[in-house]
């Protein structure tokens, strides 16, 4: 199945009822989840980091892209990639991360507003949701 077909399948999943998208941490768990009948997979930043003996947020974009490519190659399911905070402070950094993920075979992805440079904080009611942040590739 081509990446374009996987992306179309992933997009179609979003048009129907909510679905569960599990997080494989390696190629073996991706195959098990595929065999269990899930319709798509999503990378897990913390799960992948832990397989490397690191904390969440301590994995480079290059490592995430290599991990994404390995998962996309081992399964016929669409793979959505966790791109952390976009791997840089600028919108161009996020655009580069998305382009690299697409080139690695990702069918979708997510970018969170997260900052690993300081201690963990709690969110309060002042956080809003911005519109128009959806992208597909």
Listing of model-derived features with the role each one plays in the protein:
Residues 5-8, 54-81, 104, 122-137:
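Alpha-helix-loop-beta-strand connector modules within alpha/beta enzyme cores
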Residues 21-23, 43, 79-81, 110-111:
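General beta-strand structural signal in soluble alpha/beta enzymes
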Residues 16-19, 38-39, 75-79, 106-107:
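Short, well-ordered coil/turn segments that N-cap beta-strands
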Residues 26, 33, 71, 82, ...:
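Conserved, mostly hydrophobic/aromatic
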Residues 1-23, 27-35:
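N-terminal amphipathic alpha-helix/helix-capping segment at the start of soluble metabolic enzymes
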């Amino acid at each position: 199945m081509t990446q374009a077909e996987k992306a179309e399948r992933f997009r179609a999943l979003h048009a129907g009822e909510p679905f569960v998208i599990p997080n494989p941490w390696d190629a073996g768990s991706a195959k098990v989840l595929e065999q269990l009948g899930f319709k798509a997979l999503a990378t897990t930043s913390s799960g992948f980091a832990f397989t490397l003996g690191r904390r969440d947020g301590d994995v480079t974009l290059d490592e995430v892209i290599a991990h994404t490519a390995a998962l996309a190659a081992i399964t016929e399911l669409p793979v959505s990639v966790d791109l952390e905070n976009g791997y840089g402070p600028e919108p161009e950094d996020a655009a580069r991360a998305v382009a690299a993920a697409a080139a690695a075979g990702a069918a979708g992805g997510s970018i969170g507003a997260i900052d690993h440079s300081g201690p963990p904080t709690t969110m309060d009611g002042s956080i809003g949701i911005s519109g128009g942040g959806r992208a597909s590739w």
